[in-house]
Amino acid sequence: MKLEFDPGLIEEVVFKAMKLKEESGDSAFLDEYHTFADPIYENHTPDERPAKFRKIEWDFFRKMGFYKAIEEIFLEFSGIDGLVAGGVVAKARSQFDEGSNLVKGPDLEPGKKKVVIKLLAERFHDNVFLKKLIRHELMHVVDMLTASFGYKDERLGLNPMEESIIKERYSTIWDIYVDSRLISQGKETVIDKEGRYLEFAALYHGFPSDVN
């Protein structure tokens, strides 16, 4: 599957990673970056510079292993390749904006959508959690693409508040369903069983404890 990345996300991930390494006493990546980036100011016009900087940032994104980490998890889900028109990893505005979706585009084949996963830049600085999170979101995508799952992207409530409550409760049950399958496959989940129980209990506190 062809993967696309939000340039803004790449920039933030790369610079945060270089800063963290520098703070730990390793300035090798930052020094190397400047050897490529500094000459751009002398050799290119202001209009040309953004594209040049994006190319360097993309090269470092790959060199620092971020692209490979994402690609490895997408390869685990090669079965959806023929069902979608590619994947996009975009920058999330907040933790509440993180997640996955299937998105139509004017330049796509009829009936085909792109997988869009939104992430915070900070997720890339914990490689183990990043992979678990991507895998979790791609499990959601598989469900969206499975006819028997019955996923529908439609309004769920009569007003914004009601819709928010319904979505939050439904999402928790869906996450539990995803976790159960990952565990059966011997994969780690983004939240452990106790954490999911606390989430569920908080949202369904009106139910008797024996039902929970």
Please place each PLM-identified region on the residue numbering.
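Glycine-rich, often proline-containing surface loops adjacent to acidic residues and nearby aromatics
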Residues: 112-117, 158
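Metalloprotease/metallohydrolase-associated module, dominated by Zn2+-dependent proteases
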Residues: 155-212
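Short pre-active-site segment immediately N-terminal to the catalytic Zn-binding motif
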Residues: 118-133
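Long acidic/polar interaction regions in large eukaryotic complex-forming proteins
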Residues: 100-105, 119-121, 138
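Alpha-helix capping and helix-coil boundary motifs
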Residues: 28, 37-53, 122, 126, ...
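Auxiliary, metal-adjacent structural segments of Zn-dependent hydrolase domains
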Residues: 2, 6-114, 185-186
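Active-site recognition of the HExxH zinc-binding catalytic motif
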Residues: 129-149
